[in-house]
Amino acid sequence: MKIKDHKIEDIAFLESPNFNDRPDPNNISLIVIHSISLPSRNYNNDNVESFFLNNLDISKNEYFKEISDLKVSSHLYIKRRGQIIQFVPFDKRAWHAGISNYKGTKDCNDFSIGIELEGCDDDIYAVSYTHLTLPTKA
């Protein structure tokens, strides 16, 4: 994998509106990994992509009404079968870590790359974890 203009080449890039400038775009020192599925434990759909693009169809699930006003994104989303989708260029601040603190430094979004794995906390991630190593080597 190669990065050009803060985007991984040869993967899908869907630009989320949910990002802004980093205080220092050269200070990226943390990778934050989360899991997500919408609805929970429901995989292989486009609900997460729609959520990050502010296009979630709230008629699909009652839970979607509760989260429809949230504005979130991640830099990368790795689906269960290994597909990697980028939503925010790496030099920009994705909105993935919320109110956060890492080793005494607050606002992790300022200095981190956010990666979402399609899944739940208690699921197996074999393929996703294999593909997780690819962008970290780029």
Briefly describe each language-model feature range.
Residues 2-23, 30, 35-129:
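Active-site-adjacent loop/helix surface patches within enzyme catalytic domains
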